[in-house]
Amino acid sequence: SEYKQIREKTDFLSLCKTPDLAAEVTIQPVDILGVDAAILFSDILIPVEALGVNIAFDPSPVILDPIRNIQQVNNLGDIAPEKDISFVYKTIDILVSKLKVPLIGFAGAPFTLACYMVEGGGSKNFLEIKKFMYGDEKGYSMLMDKLTDCVLKYLQAQIDHGCSVVQLFDTWGGILAPKDYSHYVFPYVKYIMDNLKGAFTVYFVRGISNYLEVIKKLTCSAIGVDWGIDISEANKRLDSRFVLQGNLDPAILLADVDIIKYHASGILED
């Protein structure tokens, strides 16, 4: 494929940091598939690196010096997105000048970024982030405040450079009990959504069925719904307040086209 040809010449992080190449792979699905929007090619950990965290991709992301105490949180820098990660915005500028369809930007939500930073990568049981969250509330709050500020600035700059939509991904938000999600995660998400200006906003948390009654307090434009709940049920519990997105198990994309169409049509009918 066209993407694989580019990847053979460069590593993933370098691709994210090279505006001409990142713009090219962003445009590829629009040209090849005719999709009605483009999704910025990047990675959710790009702004984390700008805080002073060492990241490698092997091929999954690895944090080389995980955050485990309040002193390490204190040592993290502050982010000035357009200075520290200017390559992201140069990519957006190129795309806005070339695309005839809307551009979707994105970021990782504070808790999901914290999971990577504290665990050192992906995890099966997330014991380190939970130990930090329950055992050092001051350190956890400081980390989440810093990440919330970082993500808000990062996304607002994406909007300012021309993204029509921005999405906040909380991939690991679903690891917590509902009451813990409400206390340790949701306030930071709400703050970001309340303060983003100038674009449509989308929030996705994996395991959303446990949190719908809290999430309906958000001010965002749309909610991403995973495949763990019927989309009609999610809409009902969200009081029909949001545009809903998703709901298809990604594994279905490995099936034949007729099977994919069947399941996608089922979601639209629901």
Give the label of every model feature segment.
Residues D84-D270:
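Active-site loop segments of alpha/beta catalytic cores
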Residues S1-P59, F186, Y191, K261, ...:
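N-terminal basic, low-complexity leaders that serve as flexible interaction/assembly modules and, when applicable
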Residues E8-D11, Q71-A80, M133-Y140:
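Short glycine/proline- and acidic residue-enriched helix-loop micro-motifs
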Residues S60-K98:
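A gly/proline- and charged-residue-enriched helix-loop-helix capping module
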Residues I44-P47, V62, Q71, P110-T112:
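A short acidic, glycine/proline-enriched capping/turn motif at secondary-structure boundaries
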Residues I55-N69, S123-K130:
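A charged helix-plus-loop insertion that forms the helical arch/lid used to bind
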Residues T18, N69-N75, N125, D256:
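Intrinsic-disorder/low-complexity, polar/charged segments
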Residues F12, I63, D78, T171, ...:
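Short, flexible active-site loop motifs that bind/organize anionic cofactors or intermediates
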